[in-house]
A protein has these predicted regions:
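Helix-turn-helix
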Residues: 2, 13, 21-55, 59
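Short secondary-structure transition hinges
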Residues: 96-138
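Hydrophobic/aromatic-rich alpha-helical bundle segments in the mid-to-C-terminal region
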Residues: 103-110, 123, 127, 145-191
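Amphipathic alpha-helical packing segments from all-alpha helical-bundle domains
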Residues: 69, 73, 120-147, 157-160
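Hydrophobic alpha-helical connector segments
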Residues: 59, 73-102, 158-162, 185
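An amphipathic alpha-helix adjacent to DNA-recognition modules
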Residues: 8-16, 28-29, 49-73, 88, ...
Length: 197
């Protein structure tokens, strides 16, 4: 049992250190050697845990998204908030996390461009990584309609509507290099109010 715990602990340490390398170097310039150096281990040891840098990157992103999902689920289960407040708080929480991880978002964009150049569909990767988030948004919307707090509309349309704010936030932070999302926050709050009864 102790060996498994040590293995998992070391794996998490590698992922945490790999994120630092990816943020400093970008996906294309990050190497197994740089990750090993950041971890303070031999490169050959990395191969005991991961087969290549793409696998490390994917697990690093997955770990980060799990953290985001935990934050969102805690908002979702907060009984003191109505549906409008929950959706607003979730979007604002996501905006804050995006602002805090601006550099990582640039690396993710770099990675998606890299995949596209390799002939791999970035859309499939993004969809797989965001399906839980979209499900959470959909379930919050369904709950709000069921409770008579939100207007009736197609769930997919509502989900796309809310998710478009997340995409806009990423675009503003990474592509247009906005300092913060204050204007988008105001727009999102206004838009969510329009969904309320």
């Amino acid at each position: 049992m102790a060996i498994i715990v040590e293995h998992d602990k070391r794996r998490k340490q590698i992922l945490d250190n790999a994120l630092i390398v990816f943020m400093d170097e970008g996906f294309v310039n990050a190497t197994f050697q740089k990750i090993a150096d950041q971890c303070g281990i031999a490169r050959t040891i990395l191969y005991l845990y991961f087969k290549n840098k793409k696998e490390i990157f994917n697990y690093s992103i997955k770990q980060l998204l799990l953290n985001v999902e935990e934050n969102i689920n805690s908002v979702r289960s907060d009984k003191s908030l109505n549906s409008e407040e929950k959706i607003t708080k979730v979007l604002l929480t996501i905006f804050k996390l995006l602002e805090q991880n601006r550099q990582l978002l640039s690396v993710v964009l770099d990675y998606l461009v890299h995949l596209s150049k390799e002939g791999v569909s970035p859309e499939d990767r993004v969809r797989r990584r965001t399906v839980k988030l979209r499900h959470i948004l959909s379930s919050m919307f369904i709950e709000g309609v069921k409770n008579g707090e939100l207007k009736k509309m197609k769930v997919k349309a509502a989900d796309d509507y809310l998710y478009s704010f997340i995409e806009a936030a990423i675009f503003q932070l990474v592509v247009t290099k906005r300092k913060n999302l204050s204007e988008l926050r105001e727009t999102a709050i206004f838009a969510i109010k329009q969904l309320s009864l």
